[in-house]
Design a protein with these regions (language model features):
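Anion-recognition interface
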Residues: 1-342
């Protein structure tokens, strides 16, 4: 059996990958290989997912090494599991090429379904950390004009084409159902997909801890100043790493206080009414599209329950960048980052 856990982002992927990585010896004893190849020393196989041509094109050194891993696993009677969020962006042709390298007729894909509003908010925060400067309302407008056509808001945009592949078998994990029932997502995947009940969970603190909204918006202000208003910085990820390395505990406290006080006039809320029609349509689309693929039985209204209004905080870009205290602090932090780079 060959399994790819494909995310997507912000669906407990780091937690799952850390547990797979920490538990790889126990997995090996129970017939499952979590390979080092394609990981680049990280818990997840991000190099394989994002630089796939090096691994799945005929004649490359990495393709030969990957094929050797597959052959050795078969000789030992082992199954294989890989994990990376980037796999969710692969095309059917990429999965076909990967299957050829691994010499398998079937790949099992594990996809986690999370509430699309919460997922969107988390993903926007991650975008800011990667050098994007777009405001939350701007990103909402881009995707919510036609939510069922959005890859971000409707997983079936990607999964529909994958479900038609004869060599791909989908396993849909309902994130909100597991959370409501207090079921650990790692042990659930172990039991329902890998056939390994009672997997040991490592209580590992995630390294990519999410910023509070005040830190996210302050970083966006730094990005806007650094990029002179550009929508995205090519070195955004590197800048975020410098930002977090320099961020002391007292900096966090000062920035949070600054944004809550001086930035109060720029603070805004996006309100989503309870049980919006989009969510009902999406639920029906997913229930039909993933019929027979769910890893646990549940009622339709459990998939994305939304009995109450959702509220998402953000800061108005114009008002934020017209607040002298915020601009001064952001420029000061940017100057510190620039000096540290020299």
């Amino acid at each position: 059996m060959l399994v790819l856990h494909i995310g997507p982002h912000k669906t407990a992927t780091t937690y799952i990958q850390n547990n797979l990585f920490r538990g790889r010896r126990d997995l090996a004893r129970r017939g499952w290989l979590y390979p080092e190849i394609g990981a680049g020393g990280l818990p997840g196989h991000h190099d394989l997912a994002h630089n796939d041509a090096r691994y799945i094109e005929d004649g490359t050194e990495q393709a030969a090494a990957l094929n050797a891993v597959a052959k050795k696993a078969r000789e030992k009677g082992q199954n294989i599991i890989f994990s990376a969020e980037g796999f969710c962006r692969w095309s059917p042709a990429q999965f076909d090429a990967f299957a050829r390298v691994m010499e398998t007729d079937m790949i099992d894909l594990v996809h986690v379904m999370r509430d699309p509003f919460d997922l969107f908010y988390s993903h926007w925060g991650e975008e800011v950390k990667q050098g994007h400067s777009s405001s939350l309302p701007d990103r909402f407008a881009e995707h919510f004009n036609d939510p069922l056509a959005s890859r971000r808001l409707n997983p079936m945009v990607d999964l529909a084409r994958l479900s038609r592949q004869d060599n791909l078998r989908l396993h849909a994990v309902p994130y909100e159902v597991l959370r409501a029932r207090k079921i650990d997502i790692y042990t659930h995947i172990g039991t329902e997909v890998l056939g390994l009940p009672d997997l040991e969970v490592s209580n590992i603190k995630a390294k990519n801890v999410s910023f509070p909204i005040e830190m996210t918006e302050f970083l966006r202000a730094v990005t806007l100043l650094h990029g002179d208003g550009a929508r995205r910085l090519p070195d955004g990820s590197a800048m975020r790493l410098r930002f977090t390395r320099m961020l002391r505990h007292e900096d966090r406290k000062k920035i949070t206080t600054l944004m809550k006080t001086a930035g109060r006039p720029a603070r805004r809320k996006i309100r989503i009414p309870a049980n919006p029609s989009y969510m009902r349509r999406l639920t029906k689309t997913l229930m039909r599209g993933m019929e027979g693929c769910w890893t646990i039985p549940f009622e339709e209204d459990e998939l994305f329950p939304m009995p109450e209004e959702k509220t998402f905080i953000h800061y108005d870009t114009y008002l934020m960048m017209k607040t002298p205290e915020i601009v001064q602090a952001a420029q000061g932090f940017l100057d510190r980052m620039t000096v540290s780079e020299l």
